[in-house]
Amino acid sequence: MRLDSVGKRYGVRQPWVVRGVSADVPAGRLIRVEGRNGSGKSTLLRVVAGITAASEGRVTGRPASAGYVPERFPGGLPFSGREYLRHMARVHGLRGAAGYRQVEGWLERLGAAGYAGQSLGSMSKGMCQKMAIAQALLPSPGLLVLDEAWTGLDTAAREALDEAVAERVADGGAVLFVDHDPARLAGRADERWQVGGDGAVTVLAGPGPVTVPVTVPRIGPRVQRVTVRLETLDAGAVLSRLRAMDGVRVLSADVEHSDSAGGSAGAEVS
């Protein structure tokens, strides 16, 4: 999939929200979209997902199946959660037993099966969000676009969504996401798209900086020792940054490599 000189504005006399966006969206890639509030991230995601058309430029090669989770799910639809998902399954060509398996499977994985008989209008924000996520994942999409999809979810559902993202990427799907938490899927993104205030988008390779919250035990009046373990696409770079930090001494370090990540780095520092 590719964006060529893509721009979007809402009216010919309105300012450009995003403009001049040229980027590839390769299969099997995880892309984090970053930017300040109001910078145009949601608009860009809608264009990528095909929810709204670009005002200029071209989007080519979009996968036939695309899943999209909006920042705000329209919970007032006249369906129960299960009715809505069965309807969306039919829209995606999943009928009969195939549709039933997908609907019930995602309801179970997201912890929503016991509430799916409720009307969407009576559901909590978190439960509506689970319905939005389930509908996006029903067709096993080749393109998955997530706009603050983790907001309002309980811990188990957040973990289920993390797993679903990893599965889509492993199966060759492309995933783009926005999330206010800088630690969301930390170290896993293949690229970052930074949306500037002028509507321009800068494409950066790599996962970017990783923030790891830790509890540090104090073992002396001036010295603190802590063991940090994390998964990252570039474990060597993380260790180099630790060694370069003022006031930090790396006592020991090890790197384990796996097929799913660039490395698992463990370090004891003081």
Residue ranges and their predicted role:
Residues 34-36:
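The feature captures the beta-strand-to-loop junction immediately N-terminal to the Walker
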Residues 72, 79-92:
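Q-loop/switch helix immediately C-terminal to the Walker
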Residues 1-20:
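A short, flexible loop at the N-terminus of ABC-type nucleotide-binding domains that lies
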Residues 133:
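Hydrophobic anchor residue at the start of the ABC signature
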Residues 86, 90, 98-115:
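Conserved ABC ATPase "signature" region
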Residues 49:
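Helix-to-loop junction immediately C-terminal to a conserved catalytic motif
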